[in-house]
């Protein structure tokens, strides 16, 4: 996937390998993330310091890691340095050394990060929500693992994951910038065409089951003065045929400052500093959810107001003036997302990863403009959850809100200090 862009002598790349956390073994969650993070910590004949010095000396950028469904390497470099950087990319992806010292260092840092992130519930509530709403499905696996799963990982686990899941058949590379397509294609093929297939089958997660009924996950953070809440269920996949109409609905309902949800909770209600509707999509169904936070004493009021907005849009849809305003907003916001080489490369790679064509970008604003009011109402009815089928995830002072939030459904309670996965597996306290 190559695109020439000659206005500046810069090249950006995004390389993605199918896999990611969905191929972590049960009880060894976090393996993909450690594997991805270690790619640049020793590769070929260079150690971590030498790789960092090379990239820095060229004024370049190199990042590696893993997400839910894929592992990645991305970066930027000057066009004159493309041979050196392509050689480095090939080393990082094909010849990582996974030094024991770097493994132990990154593992310790990852555990510390999980602990420190719990100081701000907004950083972790999504992990709790995914693990709770997806249950036994692979999407329930937190990408970074938890304190317990990381502690039990060894360098051998990382090596096993890499050997099973990295290979030429999994690789997708997109480059955008100041180069000749023919020459760049030749250079990439010279470095990657003989990379053998990964031994393991590529991931093929099953369709997850949408939870029925109401239930509550309450994570106790005794020193909290606010309650963070996530209220939702499963949504749609990346290839949903109504995806553009759904983008319009999502933006109008909770995707901009003047959205219905933020207006009700922040502008009119004064109950929060921000509220939004989150709707990530994956190969299989993602999620749709209200996300916000409020003072402990106004927790129930804020949740009830949020639920009222959800019920209202399901019942009545979104008025034509709001739909029209939202479409104009989206059309204005879209071009700045595709200005730099890195933005373009990332967008094209993301489309290709999910089996979408480049025309998704080229036709996006015209498809937004063509979205009708009835399309928005129809997709809301199909995708947005009813009040009877909702998962509630709350992080706050359980002693002060436990009794009140019980009205939303059966409560499973954890402590913020509990490792995420083992806490959920043990169930209610």
Feature locations, PLM:
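An aromatic/glycine/proline-enriched structural segment found at the starts
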Residues: 135, 139, 143, 172-237, ...
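Non-catalytic, conformational "gating/processing" segments within enzyme and secreted inhibitor domains
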Residues: 126-127, 155-191, 385-391
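Short, charged, amphipathic alpha-helices and their helix-cap/turn boundaries
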Residues: 150-154
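M16 family metallopeptidases and their MPP-like homologs
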Residues: 3, 7-40, 46-94, 106-112, ...
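Short, surface-exposed beta-strand/loop micro-motifs that present aromatic residues
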Residues: 1-4, 159-164, 213-221, 377-382
């Amino acid at each position: 996937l190559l695109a020439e862009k000659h206005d500046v002598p810069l090249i950006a790349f995004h390389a993605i390998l199918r896999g990611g956390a969905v191929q972590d073994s049960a009880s060894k969650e976090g393996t993909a993330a450690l594997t991805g993070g270690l790619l640049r910590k020793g590769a070929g004949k260079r150690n971590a310091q030498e790789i960092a010095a090379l990239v820095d000396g060229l004024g370049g950028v190199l990042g590696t890691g893993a997400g839910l469904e894929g592992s990645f390497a991305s970066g930027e470099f000057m066009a004159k340095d493309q041979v050196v950087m392509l050689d480095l990319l090939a080393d990082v992806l094909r010849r990582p050394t996974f030094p024991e010292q770097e493994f132990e260092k990154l593992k310790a840092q990852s555990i510390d990060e999980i602990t420190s992130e719990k100081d701000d519930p907004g950083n972790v509530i999504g992990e709790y929500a995914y693990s709770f709403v997806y249950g036994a499905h692979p999407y329930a696996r937190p990408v970074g693992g938890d304190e317990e799963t990381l502690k039990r990982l060894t360098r051998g686990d990382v090596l096993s994951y890499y050997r099973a899941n990295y290979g030429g058949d999994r690789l997708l590379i997109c480059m955008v910038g100041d180069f000749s397509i023919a020459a760049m294609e030749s250079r990439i093929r010279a470095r990657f065409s003989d990379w053998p297939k990964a031994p393991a089958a590529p991931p093929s997660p099953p369709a997850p089951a949408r939870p029925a009924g109401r239930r509550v996950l309450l994570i106790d953070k005794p020193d909290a003065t606010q309650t963070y809440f996530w209220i939702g269920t499963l949504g749609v996949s990346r290839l949903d045929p109504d995806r553009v109409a759904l983008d319009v609905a999502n933006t109008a309902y909770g995707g901009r400052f003047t959205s219905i949800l933020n207006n009700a909770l922040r502008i009119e209600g004064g109950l929060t500093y921000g509220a939004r509707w989150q709707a990530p999509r994956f190969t299989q169904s993602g999620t749709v959810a209200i996300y916000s936070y409020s003072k402990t004493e106004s927790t129930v009021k804020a949740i009830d107001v949020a639920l009222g907005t959800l019920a209202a849009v399901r019942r009545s849809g979104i008025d034509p003036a709001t739909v029209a305003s939202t479409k104009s907003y989206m059309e204005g916001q879209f071009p700045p997302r595709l200005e730099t080489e890195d933005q373009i490369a990332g967008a094209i790679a993301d489309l290709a990863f999910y089996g979408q064509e480049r025309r998704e970008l080229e036709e996006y604003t015209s498809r937004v403009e063509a979205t009708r009011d009835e399309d928005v109402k129809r997709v809301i009815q199909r995708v947005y959850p009813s009040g009877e089928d909702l998962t509630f995830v709350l992080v706050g002072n359980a002693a002060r809100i436990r009794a009140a939030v019980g009205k939303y459904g059966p409560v499973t309670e954890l402590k913020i200090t509990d490792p995420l996965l083992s806490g959920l597996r043990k169930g209610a306290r």
